[in-house]
Amino acid sequence: MQAAAEPAKSAAKKGTTIKVERTKFGKALVNRAGRAVYLFDIEEGPTSECYDECARAWPPVLTKGKPLAGKGVSKGKLGTTTRRDGRRQVTYAGHPLYFYVHDTPDEILCQDVVEFGGRWLLVRPNGTALR
């Protein structure tokens, strides 16, 4: 019984994979499942400004381990920041990363949307906002 619990425990410590895929907006960062990730343009540096209602609409991309660089992603640009609740949020080129709550791997709904005092944009492989 203990052996069965061990793989699940070690899988939980794995880092979140970020990779590049071609979207209808151009090449952009996505997670392993193909779900788009965004940056929030009012954030300067790795500290998240999106909490409470904002984080319910734009959940942070979290990781339990070191984030993993998938296809097209620069390993050196991946990092983490610690949120107020102690969870680790994935960053890329210094930008905290987020999902949009209603996106799916097949559908990007909120590219270049203004909400919560800033603009939400997909992230290019070089770490800049896709405009």
What are these regions (language model features)?
Residues 1-131:
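Compact beta-sheet-dominated domain cores in extracellular/mature segments
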